[in-house]
């Protein structure tokens, strides 16, 4: 048995050079220029076809979509509720009346949120008649004014701190927008405290949402739309250094807007906790 001869470094280097380019056959990396050309042509045609197929599929799908109204809306049984300002942790508001920095961010968020509701920002909107849905048929859709004065003590006009410095904080509650929704009745957002150490005031009175703000026609069609708001002001009983209360709000006053569902306990309702320290 003879041992396999070990190639020298120069022999291995020469073979690699020959593999990279063979001057006698004109091959580069083992293929002729014609072979490389055919392979590149194949992949160019193959991936070009895939790109064209993907583009056509996307185009065909987009033709079925309406740019102004969602195609599928039957799975939204009833709107939910949202609160503002955004809580620091999981629907809990905690602050100290004697420490402005603890509620400074909440006040700033409320100011920013209510800025589009100022008189100046709404001067080009329509003063709509109360008590009835504002039905429109386009192509131009007008948006109704929502006077911030309806929020009374929570408007930021009479109290720049929205009640936080006095231990009577304001929380804004709004109903999620659903295109073309018209409430069957007179919608309102009803809020009650779970504990007996506080009372709740709502603005507008009884948390009423005027029908003139319905229906909503979508972001692109209904430019300038102002969503109706309900302000909830928590008023604690005096005499306690630490005051806590959980507030539950739900949609009421209509037959088609639900607030109970075994599968979705948050449908048409929201609850939040307020903790105020001296």
Curated annotation (Swiss-Prot):
All ranges on the Extracellular side of the membrane: 57-278
Function in brief: This is the non-catalytic component of the active enzyme, which catalyzes the hydrolysis of ATP coupled with the exchange of Na(+) and K(+) ions across the plasma membrane. The exact function of the beta-3 subunit is not known.
Keyword Endoplasmic reticulum: no
Alphabetical list of PROSITE patterns matching this protein: ATPASE_NA_K_BETA_1 (PS00390)
GO biological process: intracellular potassium ion homeostasis; intracellular sodium ion homeostasis; membrane repolarization; positive regulation of potassium ion import across plasma membrane; positive regulation of sodium ion export across plasma membrane; potassium ion import across plasma membrane; protein localization to plasma membrane; protein stabilization
Start and end residues of each stretch annotated as immunoglobulin-like: 186-278
Topological domains annotated Cytoplasmic: 1-35
Assembly behavior: The sodium/potassium-transporting ATPase is composed of a catalytic alpha subunit, an auxiliary non-catalytic beta subunit and an additional regulatory subunit. Interacts with catalytic alpha subunit ATP12A.
Protein name listed in UniProt: Sodium/potassium-transporting ATPase subunit beta-3
Family note: Belongs to the X(+)/potassium ATPases subunit beta family.
Cellular localisation: Apical cell membrane; Basolateral cell membrane; Melanosome
